[in-house]
């Protein structure tokens, strides 16, 4: 039985003081919550303080990071290694977010390397996949997502997929725009992704993978989206 996961990507919001205040507030609001995992992904500058706050309070909230560089160390100015994140107690790492693909120009091979590096450091990548509005309107949404999955997971085994992977479907046209895919749209892609995983890695492995939806999720639509199987 998959445990639902709710992950919050804070993007470039909150300095380290504001992040600590927010995670303390969240921790209080989530007291007694059962049957779901919650992860927060603050900016890099706040990771250490948020990690310490979660540890000191014994919070069940799991720490996540927004990105990573696929090397253990070296002359990579401005980058953060998987080992550094693991040392802070990070559990989940977002890789391939559409904003990094679109704004920074990250390609599938780099996303694949990041996902592998996160896995090998004992953390779980949240692999982001999704299509543009143009691709959806041209009927290419499925082929786009399939290409991203194949590029990122070509070297993975069924055991690795079943224990070390989360996939986030994030239609690019719905991110930060106020537009949201309908629950039926999200479920259609969810079904395709799980079917692709089953064909590639076997039904048992596919059934263990948690598939998230991201894209203008709000309190008034979260329930409908979470209700999709």
Regions found by a protein language model. Name each.
Residues 1-229:
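Active-site loop-to-helix "anion-binding N-cap" substructures in soluble metabolic enzymes
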